[in-house]
């Protein structure tokens, strides 16, 4: 005698009709399909959550790195700042589209023009204006590697390329005229 399933045994005994058996089979199949879809949805949600976590982690790393660079730039400027006690010559420079002026002495003016010194923006307490500091060119190069927007004037960075067939190449325009 072959083994009968429980459903077949109940049908044979007359305890269940074939319609009820078919209905039970349909609901069982439906619940299996729903469970499979739920597992797939859970898996998809896990993947999406992992992707969001990865993006958030990357953003946090970038923010921490930017904060660290900002602190390094501030420290470099403060430690290497050159103070000028009695500046009597107004030195004009541009910061973005604004023209700013600091007072320097003759030697500092010559070094700024020659590129031995540079002017950096020192942000103080999240103030967008901040103040300006005169620093050595070697420090300006280090700062430019971390945050180029902090360097306002560095003659080595802003040197214009010479045009080979410029007819006025021999006539330099003096940038230290006193009016």
Swiss-Prot record:
A Gene Ontology term for the protein's cellular component: cytosol
Organism: Escherichia coli (strain K12)
InterPro entries assigned: DUF2058
Name of the protein in question: Uncharacterized protein YaiL
GN (gene name): yaiL
Region Disordered, residue ranges: 27-54
Pfam families: DUF2058
